[in-house]
Amino acid sequence: MIKKIIITVCTLIFFVTNVSFADITFWTTEVQPARMAKQEAMAKDFEAKTGIKVEVIPVEEKDLGTRATAAAAAGDLPDVIYHTLQYVLPWAEAGILDVDANNAVVKELGKKTFAPGALNMAKSGSKIAAVPVLSLIHI
């Protein structure tokens, strides 16, 4: 399920933003070797289907906030960031997240694609600031 959502999100971001580029840069905090291998395989599948190369860049979760802030200041943010909920509001306010593009992706996929709670937690004002890709319930 996550594979399908990530591939769909990458595709939609490409088309929604009307950016003409050959590559997508994807930062991930899933840095364990088995998970990196799976993400690399998904990137190759995406490239085979679209002709667009995805560069999967591992970023340790503890370094993500600092690295994203520095990349934003340098004007060198990746196209897609796999991140936790804690970053949604501050990054939306700082302009690190493209709220309009993310909102358009959710609209294109349809809100019924997502758990209502996940969408509510990803809101910034009246818009969805980040595309939920995982929703866990802890009991």
Kindly give the residue locations of the regions a language model identified.
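Sec-dependent signal peptide recognition
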Residues: 3-9
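Short helices/loops that flank or line small-molecule/ion binding pockets
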Residues: 65-76, 93-94
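Extracytoplasmic "Venus flytrap"
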Residues: 24-39
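Short alpha-helix C-terminal cap/hinge motif
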Residues: 40-56
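Sec/Tat signal peptide C-region and signal peptidase I cleavage site
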Residues: 17-22
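Hinge/lid segment of periplasmic solute-binding proteins
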Residues: 85-136
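Structural recognition of the beta-strand scaffold that forms the well-ordered cores
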Residues: 25-27, 55-58, 79-82, 130-132
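Short helix-initiation/N-cap motifs at beta->coil->alpha
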Residues: 58-67, 86
